[in-house]
Each structure stands twice: as C-alpha cells, then as structure tokens.
Amino acid sequence: MNIHEYQGKAIFRSMGVAVPEGRVAYTAEEAVEKAKELDSKVYVVKAQIHAGGRGKAGGVKIAKSLSEVETYAKELLGKTLVTHQTGPEGKEIKRLYIEEGCDIQKEYYVGFVIDRATDRVTLMASEEGGTEIEEVAAKTPEKIFKETIDPVVGLAPYQARRIAFNINIPKESINKAAKFLVSLYNVFIEKDCSIVEINPLVTTGEGEVLALDAKVNFDDNALFKHKDIQELRDLEEEDPKEIEASKYDLSYIALDGDIGCMVNGAGLAMATMDTINHFGGNPANFLDVGGGATKEKVTEAFKIILGDENVKGIFVNIFGGIMKCDIIAEGIVAAVKEVELTLPLVVRLEGTNVERGKEILKESGLAIEPAATMAEGAQKIVKLVKEA
C-alpha cells in the first residue's frame, strides 16, 4: 500500500524523523490559508500523487509570496501530471502540500529496502540526491553505499555514522544524520514497511538534517496490524481494476500491452509475461488468481481483464497443484459464457486432473484454443491477437 508524501511525513514527525513544517490543502484558497500558518518567507507547493518524478514534471513549485502560492495552487489543482512513473495517462492533482522552505546546503538520497539476496533490510545512501537512484546506479554505482542490517541488533549507530561519512555529510552534522537514520529505520520496522525512501534528504545552513520528501510503501500482508495506516489509503489514486481485484483476493497490476494474462502463482505469472514478450507480444496485465481459485474467482478475473479496453486476447496459464485443473476448466467455461467472450482465448493447463480439465474445455463447444506448453500458448495468443 502506498501513501501520499504529507501522510508519510506525518508518520516521520511522530517518530522523531525531522521534516519541515507543512499543511495539506484541497483548494487554492485553502493553500493560501495554510501557507499563512507557516512561519516562512518561502513556500514549496507540492502536487500530491502516488508517483515519483513530480519535480521534473512541474509538480513542485517554489513560491516567494502568498500570491504566488495562490497562483501555483490554481495552476496545479485539477491538472493531470505526467511523470515517468504515472504512464502517459498521468494522474490528476486533487490535493497539495504547502511546506515551508529551507536553506538547502546539499541534497542526498537515503532509503531502506528489503534485499532479497541477503534476506535483510538494507540501508542505501548516496550524495547524489535529487536524481533518480536508478540513474545513479546505472551511471555512477560507486556513489551508492549500503549497510546490511542485522534484524536482531537493528541499525547500529556505527553503521549510521559510517553511511553519513561515506556520503560526505558535513562533520558537524554527522551525529544528527546518524540519529536521523536510526529513527528512519524504526519507522521502517515498526510500521511494517516494504520501502522507505527520502530523495532528497538535505543538510541546511543551520546544520539541520531534514527529509524534504517521503516515499513510504507498506507490506500489505501486515496491514491488519495497523488500522491507522489502513485509514490513510487513497482509493482515488489506485487503478479501479486493482481495487476490484483485491475484493476477490486477486493480485492484479495493469500494464500497457494488449494480451490479458490469468495465471496462478507470481513466479509463473512473471514467466508467462516474459514468454509472451519473447514471442513478440505485450502483456496487458499481471493477474495471479492464487492457489484457491473458484468458479466465481475465475469469472471475476475475466471481468477484470476485460475491463481493460486495450485487451485483444487472453492467455490462461494454470499449473494445478492444490488447485485442480478440472475445477479451473469449469470456471473458465462458466466465465466465458457469462461474459460472452468474443476475444481470442488460449488455455494451457498442467497438473492435477489435467486430462479431465482438457475434456471439459473441449466438450464445452466454446472457441477455446488449447496449448500443451507455455511456449506454445504464448505463440498462439500472440499470433491470434496480431491476426484479429
């Protein structure tokens, strides 16, 4: 689950992570009133959307007067902001964060992530703040420093100080930076985050260490422990199809292609998308029906896939382990009839009760193209979509 910058900063502030003062506003008039509450001569007007790259896209403005705050607020509210993370459709700006300006001396990047290779939380930092960390990793990887954290000990003060030294935090601010990083680590652990990222972290002319940004994602599997965080969810920022999928315990992520995919298991889903790409197709989605799919679940999965008007064909790739192939086949037949599917459909089944599953598909009399392997299925759906 993602949250807005202003929500992330509120969490930071409550747990001892230093951030500038700021207020959220929903209208231009409210933006001016909120700016008046801040003891500042310079204001930062920030678009609040669930995407990075806002600054480069024109979603962050520096205002030197209340009249400029109003001008920028009117300019941004209601605008569709397109960044490298939103896709070409962009996201509508429905709220702003009005923040006090500060005397920035230097910008840095810091982030806590889960390193799958070490099964540990890892602190990453760089003195190349203000730019995308992926860009830094590609061009100057030597400027990224990492600390792997022992889950029993937590982020040790010496590790925090070492990172601060490595990214050239001024000597007089080293201890503040180390304390800042330890507090940020506590946010990551106590709130069950999957990522906490600040870009930029800054040092000021007064020697302060502040978070000028806040990207916080939470582990969905741990949200049941955090009712307060669940309340921060902004459904307007999420894909309606993803919201609908979550109601049926389906994992759905929309992509830019035209071949709908329905698979069980995240690994098989990714392999399926890779195979479609390999044969010249473009997946329209990632959709994992999980290990306990029912007829109802399969039907809803079809409806969600077909909710994307770009979809021109569907590839169902199921390995029946716990989930039996005959049950899946019955679900596919029922779903095709209910949604009155007219698009090309290729189905590859393998595993428990696979022969019975294939018989059910064949006996249905529906236009379902069978495939014996994932590669064959991918080739067939790519060909059918191109011929359609």
From Swiss-Prot:
Residues 9-244 form the ATP-grasp domain. Mg(2+) binds at N199, D213. The keyword Hydrolase does not apply. The keyword Oxidoreductase does not apply. It comes from the Bacteria. Pathway: Carbohydrate metabolism; tricarboxylic acid cycle; succinate from succinyl-CoA (ligase route): step 1/1. Keywords: ATP-binding, Ligase, Magnesium, Metal-binding, Nucleotide-binding, Tricarboxylic acid cycle. It holds the Pfam family Ligase_CoA. InterPro entries: ATP-grasp, ATP-grasp_succ-CoA_synth-type, ATP_grasp_subdomain_1, Succ-CoA_synthase_bsu_CS, SUCC_ACL_C, Succ_CoA_ligase-like_bsu, Succinyl-CoA_synth-like. Its EC number is 6.2.1.5. Binds 1 Mg(2+) ion per subunit. GO terms for biological process: succinyl-CoA metabolic process; tricarboxylic acid cycle. One of its GO terms (molecular function) is succinate-CoA ligase (GDP-forming) activity. It is an enzyme of class 6 (ligase). Its cofactor is Mg(2+). Substrate binds at N264, G321, I322, M323. One of its GO terms (cellular component) is succinate-CoA ligase complex. Succinyl-CoA synthetase functions in the citric acid cycle (TCA), coupling the hydrolysis of succinyl-CoA to the synthesis of either ATP or GTP and thus represents the only step of substrate-level phosphorylation in the TCA. The beta subunit provides nucleotide specificity of the enzyme and binds the substrate succinate, while the binding sites for coenzyme A and phosphate are found in the alpha subunit. Belongs to the succinate/malate CoA ligase beta subunit family. This is Succinate--CoA ligase [ADP-forming] subunit beta. The gene is sucC.
